[in-house]
Amino acid sequence: MGSKDNAISNDSALVLSLLLLLLLPLLHEAAEGCDMFTGRWVKDDSYPLYNSSTCPFIRHEFSCQRNGRPDLDYSTFRWQPLSCKLARFNGLQFLKKNKGKKIMFVGDSLSLNQWQSLACMLHSSVPNSTYTLTTQGSISTYTFKEYGLELKLDRNVYLVDIVREKIGRVLKLDSINDGKNWVEMDTLIFNTWHWWSRRGPAQPWDLIQIGTNVTKDMDRVAAFEIALGTWGKWVDTVLNTKKTRVFFQGISPSHYKGVLWGEPAAKSCVGQKEPLLGTKYPGGLPAEVGVLKRALGKISKPVTLLDITMLSLLRKDAHPSVYGLGGRNSSGDCSHWCLSGVPDTWNEILYNYMVE
């Protein structure tokens, strides 16, 4: 009986092993295919990931707590995808994994928001580790010296060039000379959108050029799409994506129209203290999200979209509002984000791509 039982046991073990071998690729595929961007915000008292009052990097306009915001609930929500759970950010693991590497954010003040968030997340993990901050031209660098990690920001709001010429400041939709600053990076996170709608004194160019055609202005969404196409061609023709991993930060939304989140009386994010607790934003996605996804779809080389628009749309409560740059005499900043806050989640998702 013993030998027969052993034979049955061995046969069962063999069948189980074969089943596991067959299922492993499917399990791996399920993990790889996890949708990190569809989910909801849940209250979690283990958040935020760092104390904003002790982070030395946060600029005045993002430092809501220091600027007197009395409620701190906005920093105690965790993003929970419907189909999986994000690995919690581990700063020490991130530093070790990226030892000696160069990571650069390229874009506007939303890139600044995310860059400072990641710097705080890392600093809180190794508070006694030496760091330096240097600025050269448009590029600022936090260096975590013990790990040789350079965390960079290139302030480039359009990604394409603005050139001063005799005729004025020309926005060249088909030119990327700043790309020379990006090619040596190990990881790049790009972003552009918010400046494309600027007009008047806030607009940093006088003319738009495509090829030999120069014009005073054009449809801004069309210009945005052309610039993204130029950037995409640069990725395909210049960047070595075997050396450099490329991400694109999705469109970061603003909250200036309460009707879009089902509160018609609200003229902006001022006074908002709770996120939307569902999985969808009543006003839907802004049109520029489709433009961005269409442009990314034309790129041959691998580019990962950090598709943070919907999860950020649900956070009408998390902007600086009157606790930002303009203070309480302003109409309120409903475009940028308090730190700690929503950009920490963008970086947790980035961490799940880069480390996990």
UniProtKB/Swiss-Prot annotation:
Keywords: Membrane, Signal-anchor, Transmembrane, Transmembrane helix. A motif (GDS motif) lies at residues 107-109. It is found in: Membrane. A motif (DCXHWCLPGXXDXWN motif) lies at residues 333-347. Signal peptide: none annotated. InterPro entries: TBL, TBL_C, TBL_N. GO terms for cellular component: membrane. The chain crosses the membrane at residues 12-31. GO terms for molecular function: O-acetyltransferase activity. It is a single-pass type II membrane protein. Its main location: membrane. Contains 2 motifs that are conserved in esterases, but it is unlikely that this protein belongs to the catalytically active pectin esterases. Belongs to the PC-esterase family. TBL subfamily. May act as a bridging protein that binds pectin and other cell wall polysaccharides. Probably involved in maintaining esterification of pectins. May be involved in the specific O-acetylation of cell wall polymers. PANTHER family: PROTEIN TRICHOME BIREFRINGENCE-LIKE 41, PROTEIN TRICHOME BIREFRINGENCE-LIKE 9-RELATED. This is Protein trichome birefringence-like 41. It comes from Arabidopsis thaliana (Mouse-ear cress).
